[in-house]
């Protein structure tokens, strides 16, 4: 029923015409360095584009997420659409985009500048075609998704300070795949302290912190975990 609405059909048609513009935007964002914990420059540009495309209520929250609210009629659930802004590549990486035919090469252009491109294009299609929703939509660029970032941006989004009924994460380039569900994640920092000593003179009678952590890692590697729900550890 939604797909049959004239304004939605018009949005689909416009999205097809909008490909070149969306690609230019993807390239622009990719060429703004955004390693985990240092997404601020890309975040400022994402916030600027959200405002350009019609959002009045756009903030960069204390942790660095960009959150833009598109009000609905007030009678429905609040849906957040998010794409992480950080890249797995370290600071100083050459992020200049190189084109070969129809293929674009650059660190982070897929993961996750493609997600940011889609997020902003969806916003444009809603605004340009005057699509109204019952509930509010939150357009979110999150920080700290990769590695030691520990998904901190998404976790902060759900810290209870905002009412959110649903969340759609847009990540990478596999547009033909939809995953439904939520994966729990826990991270621990384990510190092993020892008395110290000389590796030769004190061998055998002073405990080695390195040996202790290696033994702990070996035991963890032998853990049996459930297959359903799928459970992993590193």
Residue map of PLM features:
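Short glycine-aspartate micro-motif
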Residues: 78-82, 165-169, 187-189
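Acidic-enriched catalytic cores of C-N bond-cleaving enzymes acting on peptides and small amides
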Residues: 180, 202-234
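A short glycine-threonine-serine/GTX helix/turn-capping micro-motif
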Residues: 13, 177-178, 197-204
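Predominant activation on well-ordered alpha-helical scaffold segments within soluble catalytic domains
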Residues: 23, 27, 44-47, 116-124, ...
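Buried hydrophobic positions in well-ordered alpha/beta secondary-structure cores of metabolic enzymes
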Residues: 33, 50, 68, 81-84, ...
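Acidic/His- and Gly-rich active-site-bordering loop/insert found
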Residues: 2-105
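Acidic/histidine-rich catalytic neighborhood of metal-dependent amide-processing enzymes
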Residues: 40, 103-104, 108-183, 230-232
């Amino acid at each position: 029923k939604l797909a049959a609405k004239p304004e939605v059909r018009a949005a689909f048609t416009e999205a097809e015409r909008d490909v070149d513009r969306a690609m230019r935007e993807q390239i622009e964002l990719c060429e703004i360095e955004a390693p985990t914990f240092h997404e601020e420059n890309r975040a400022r540009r994402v916030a600027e584009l959200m405002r350009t495309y019609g959002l009045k209520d756009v903030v960069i929250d204390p942790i660095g997420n960009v959150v833009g609210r598109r009000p609905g009629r007030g009678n429905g659930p609040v849906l957040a659409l998010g794409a992480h802004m950080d890249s797995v590549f370290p600071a100083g990486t050459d992020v200049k985009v190189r084109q070969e035919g129809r293929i674009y090469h650059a660190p982070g252009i897929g993961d996750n500048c493609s997600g940011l491109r889609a997020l902003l294009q969806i916003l444009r299609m809603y605004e340009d075609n005057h699509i109204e929703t019952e509930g509010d939509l939150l357009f979110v660029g999150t920080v700290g998704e990769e590695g030691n970032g520990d998904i901190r941006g998404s976790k902060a989004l759900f810290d209870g300070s905002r009412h959110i009924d649903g969340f759609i994460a847009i990540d990478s380039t596999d547009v033909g795949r939809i995953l439904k569900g939520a994966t729990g994640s826990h991270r621990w920092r384990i510190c092993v302290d020892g008395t110290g000593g000389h590796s030769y003179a004190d061998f055998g009678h002073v405990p080695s912190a390195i040996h202790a952590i290696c033994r702990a890692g070996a035991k963890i590697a032998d853990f049996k975990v459930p297959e359903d729900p799928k459970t992993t550890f590193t």
